A protein has these predicted regions:
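The feature captures the beta-strand-to-loop junction immediately N-terminal to the Walker
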Residues: 39-41
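Short coil-to-helix segment of the ABC ATPase nucleotide-binding domain corresponding to the Q-loop/switch region
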Residues: 100-109
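Conserved ABC transporter NBD signature motif
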Residues: 62-73
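Helix-to-loop junction immediately C-terminal to a conserved catalytic motif
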Residues: 54
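Catalytic Walker B motif of ABC-type/P-loop ATPase nucleotide-binding domains
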Residues: 165-168
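A short, proline-enriched helix->beta-strand linker immediately N-terminal to the Walker B motif
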Residues: 159-163
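Conserved ABC ATPase signature
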Residues: 140-150
Length: 225
């Protein structure tokens, strides 16, 4: 679907001793079934933009639409439910629960939505097997490699069949070959007609996206790849 996610005149400022405007009148439309890379130096607004799209934070000014429906940032509970069902989030530091196994980390994300433990366990096990972790189901995060941990994080992000996947430096701490595998797992999500947006400093992976978006001076400059 074209223009599934629409950002219009988005600005975001943070109040410090001096007001800092990170995003400046940013507008862009994203389509499903595509993967977009965000590039830019540290402080260019990549993570801030992902936080706005994920509804973790709100813009100072501007409008965000999903499927032509505007987000009301005063409806926190409704937005939390929308995010849990429709947006999968992956971080460089994968934020896995340290006292839970790989299987538990994934199935708990679905249990909060489905309220069906057996169904959640089955979905989680199937996803982990698909990403090559059938022999790591009962391993804790401390027992997993960086690449294995990110595979768990990706499985957790997609278990609720989200329409959008957001990834903030998902390959940043991985060696090149492992990072390639993780990128391919993300790229394959296009086949499920999902919208994938990932922030990266790595030009190689940025160029593999359908669209490369440079974050410059708080706005987006599209670059065709």
């Amino acid at each position: 679907m074209n223009n599934f996610l629409q950002l219009k005149n988005i600005s975001k400022s943070f109040k410090t001793e001096k007001k800092i405007k990170v995003l400046k009148n940013l507008s862009y439309n994203f389509s499903k079934g595509k993967i977009y890379s965000l590039m830019g130096p540290s402080g260019s607004g990549k993570s801030t933009l992902l936080n706005l799209i994920s509804l973790i934070d709100r813009p100072t000014i501007g409008n965000i639409k999903f499927n032509n429906t505007s987000i009301n940032f005063n409806q926190n509970k409704i937005n939390d439910i929308f995010r849990a069902k429709n947006i999968g989030i992956i971080y460089q530091e994968n934020n896995l629960l340290p006292d839970f196994t790989a299987l538990e980390n994934v199935y708990l994300a679905n249990l909060s939505i489905s309220n069906n433990k057996d169904l959640a366990l089955t979905k989680a096990e199937n996803l982990l097997k698909k990403v090559g972790l059938s022999n790591r189901l009962d391993h804790f995060p401390s027992q997993l490699s960086g690449g294995e941990s990110q595979r768990v994080a990706i499985s957790r992000a997609i278990i609720n069949d989200p329409e959008i996947i957001l990834a903030d430096e998902p390959t940043g701490s991985l060696d090149f070959n492992t990072a390639k595998d993780i990128f391919e797992l993300l790229n394959n999500q296009k086949q499920s007609n999902r919208l994938i947006i990932f922030a990266t400093h790595n030009r190689y992976f940025a160029n593999k996206a359908d669209y490369l978006l440079e974050m410059i001076d708080g706005s987006i400059k599209p670059t065709y790849v």
